[in-house]
């Protein structure tokens, strides 16, 4: 007669056989299913972790590159502003140089014109002195040639003044 376990109608041999088969199944599942499944899960976990690390590294590198680009853009703006300031300063210096050269040239032209006017004035004075001397000699020679009355003297002076006016 079969041995009963705890008064139940389950034979002890069946329980032992089921327990042995279950343990063998557990060992086989652990070896062929649980181990590879856990290995795959571990690989997947490591892969996901490495992907997260790579994404974090890429994100950090992208942030760094963005910051570098911002810094380069800022530097470019500063350099552009400096270039503009240098160009303005150079243009201002050129303007001042051109104005100074124009003033100097105007002063030179003015000085030259004043000298030319002075020469022409001196030449005109010299010419007038020669004409006055010549007229004086002519008047004196005519006076000597004839003795003049007051009326003749006035007429002679008017004639000579008229003659000098026509000569001009």
UniProtKB/Swiss-Prot annotation:
Question: What is the name of this protein?
Answer: ATP synthase subunit b
The keyword Thylakoid belongs to this UniProt entry's keyword annotation? no
Report the locations given in the UniProt record: Cell membrane
Name the job this protein performs. F(1)F(0) ATP synthase produces ATP from ADP in the presence of a proton or sodium gradient. F-type ATPases consist of two structural domains, F(1) containing the extramembraneous catalytic core and F(0) containing the membrane proton channel, linked together by a central stalk and a peripheral stalk. During catalysis, ATP synthesis in the catalytic domain of F(1) is coupled via a rotary mechanism of the central stalk subunits to proton translocation.
Family in the record: Belongs to the ATPase B chain family.
Q: How does it sit in the membrane?
A: Single-pass membrane protein
Q: Enumerate the InterPro entries for this protein.
A: ATP_synth_B-like_membr_sf, ATP_synth_b/b'su_bac/chlpt, ATP_synth_F0_bsu_bac, ATP_synthase_B_chain
């Amino acid at each position: 007669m079969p041995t009963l376990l705890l008064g139940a109608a389950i034979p002890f041999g069946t329980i032992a056989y089921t327990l042995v088969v279950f343990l063998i199944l557990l060992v086989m599942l652990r070896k062929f299913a649980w181990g590879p499944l856990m290995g795959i899960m571990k690989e997947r976990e490591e892969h996901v972790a490495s992907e997260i690390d790579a994404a974090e590294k890429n994100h950090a590198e992208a942030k760094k590159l963005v910051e570098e680009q911002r810094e380069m853009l800022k530097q470019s703006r500063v350099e552009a502003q400096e270039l503009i300031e240098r160009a303005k300063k150079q243009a201002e210096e050129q303007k001042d140089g051109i104005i100074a050269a124009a003033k100097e040239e105007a002063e030179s032209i003015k000085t030259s014109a004043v000298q030319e006017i002075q020469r022409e004035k001196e030449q005109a004075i010299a010419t007038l002195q020669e004409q006055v001397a010549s007229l004086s000699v002519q008047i004196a020679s005519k006076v000597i040639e004839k003795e003049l009355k007051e009326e003749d003297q006035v007429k002679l002076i008017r004639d000579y003044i008229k003659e000098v006016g026509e000569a001009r």
